[in-house]
Amino acid sequence: MSEDTQTATENKPDIKPRSRVVTDGIHAAPARGMFRAVGMGDDDFAKPQIGVASSWNEITPCNLSLNRLAQGAKEGVHAGGGFPMQFGTISVSDGISMGHEGMHFSLVSREVIADSVETVMQAERIDGSVLLAGCDKSLPGMLMAAARLDLASVFLYAGSIMPGWVKLEDGSEKEVTLIDAFEAVGACAAGKMSRGDLDRIERAICPGEGACGGMYTANTMACIGEALGMSLPGSAAPPSADRRRDEFARKSGEAVVNLLRLGITARDIMTKKAFENAIAVTMAFGGSTNAVLHLLAIAREAEVELTLDDFNRIGDKIPHLGDLKPFGRYVMTDVDKIGGVPVIMKALLDAGLLHGDCLTVTGKTLAENLASINPPDLDGKILRALDNPIHKTGGITILHGSMAPEGAVVKSAGFDADVFEGTARVFEREQGALDALDNGKINKGDVVVIRYEGPKGGPGMREMLAITGAIKGAGLGKDVLLLTDGRFSGGTTGLCIGHVAPEAVDGGPIAFVKDGDRIRVDIAARSFDLLVDEAELESRKVGWEPLPAKFTKGVLAKYAKLVHSASTGAYCG
């Protein structure tokens, strides 16, 4: 028996499976004394202790609502019969850290978040958790922590930002999101947009609190939280400023106490079938390629075997239905207007494309939740009908071939044609490609190869939104293929292949590409090949040494020593 002795009755789970060691008996007197100082009374020591963890900060709009939502979650915990204990963790804003050295720290923050939540929960022997997050890496970081700890846990998303509205100097008006600013930078640099219009877009893109508005990484991961069963049904889509989120916060607090009473933990919910549901929903929405990386990492924490092959296997059966930015016309608030994530889940379930028997944080199955909500049908515009999809298969494809023996990830929704063959233009890290584009040295038909940006070689597997936005802004979005051992933003558009594995620093084929080589990708065949004679390629390996480490101390140096391949989720350990 562990040191945290449980006292459950024969048929009833203990609602304090861990905290008794700090609340019960004479040896807990020092801990009880500290608890009294933070407001606990005699009656509270019999209640389960619930951690309310959030990545709240004032650096970015993504997280601004989280302190308010944490208060709501605490109210719900009290109402449910528990005692809430609020604590915080970090968050990195990709929108601010994009395109410079700061982006090295983005994916690293996912691990720091998971580790920090685990550290507090384990050190203080807290019984369960409500985990709140708003930015791209904080969502998977929280879900990784939940899976690793395997306690009663509910995840709650901060919510999406409302779209901005801009009137340009030619009199045209349109909705805009953060991604429009990155593309406007490229257009302005190429002389295709005035500085005045760039300024107008800058001032319009973020009208208030919330995460980036399209089906980018944060909204994709919020949909995944709901599809996995780790978030309350219907909680992913309402915008951050909508006070329905406060009610979801209160209900999340009540729900975690109910999970303790039922004896349900995170791994009871995050099963292989649940991950298959999450992949299916991601494919149907046309979600971010970052979902591949994050789902692999979350599954590993849940001790569920998930591989890149699962994404193609499921994607083959799931049509792409969401006409959502970055490739489509609509944003997350539009999804909310037509009923939210339950709409697409109900359609997939009715078509036999989801597992309805998966348990969720309500204590009920996915099918039971959807029957209770009874969401409307797909609207046919924002979310297309199953028999009239945007693409017949999912929006993300895993490629293999001589260019990526361990795999690469492509948002196939961005390709108008299945086949692209072009000439390599090779750059060591992102800045070289940006400089070449600014100087007019990237042309139609080029394959821009950016290497030494992988999990270990970067380190941190930076997102390439600055260069992809600039390529699109320069009018080359459909004519230039970009491939990298780094990542792409959920807002990236164009012809982009990322997560190329093995990465350059590990001696993957990407390390040996030279200017002028021909590279061919065939989306339908899922092939991705370097068209160089094998003997020539082997000769290039003679005497090869990777670029020296860019960081030799601090968190990035530690990360580079611990991180694994993107093909397995870029997990540490």
Curated annotation (Swiss-Prot):
Q: Which residues form the active site?
A: S489
Q: How does it assemble?
A: Homodimer.
Instruction: Give the source's domain of life in one word.
Output: Bacteria
Residues carrying N6-carboxylysine: K137
What organism, scientifically named, is this protein from? Arthrobacter sp. (strain FB24)
Q: Which reaction does it catalyse?
A: (2R)-2,3-dihydroxy-3-methylbutanoate = 3-methyl-2-oxobutanoate + H2O; (2R,3R)-2,3-dihydroxy-3-methylpentanoate = (S)-3-methyl-2-oxopentanoate + H2O
Annotated PROSITE patterns: ILVD_EDD_1, ILVD_EDD_2
What exactly does this protein do?
Answer: Functions in the biosynthesis of branched-chain amino acids. Catalyzes the dehydration of (2R,3R)-2,3-dihydroxy-3-methylpentanoate (2,3-dihydroxy-3-methylvalerate) into 2-oxo-3-methylpentanoate (2-oxo-3-methylvalerate) and of (2R)-2,3-dihydroxy-3-methylbutanoate (2,3-dihydroxyisovalerate) into 2-oxo-3-methylbutanoate (2-oxoisovalerate), the penultimate precursor to L-isoleucine and L-valine, respectively.
**Annotated [2Fe-2S] cluster binding sites:** C62, C135, C212
What's the name of the protein?
Answer: Dihydroxy-acid dehydratase
Q: Which InterPro entries match?
A: DHAD_IlvD/Edd (IPR050165), Dihydro-acid_dehy_C (IPR042096), DihydroxyA_deHydtase (IPR004404), DiOHA_6PGluconate_deHydtase_CS (IPR020558), ILV_EDD_C (IPR056740), ILV_EDD_N (IPR000581), IlvD/EDD_N (IPR037237)
Gene name of this polypeptide: ilvD
Q: Which UniProt keywords apply?
A: 2Fe-2S, Amino-acid biosynthesis, Branched-chain amino acid biosynthesis, Iron, Iron-sulfur, Lyase, Magnesium, Metal-binding
Which cofactors must be present for this protein to function? [2Fe-2S] cluster; Mg(2+)
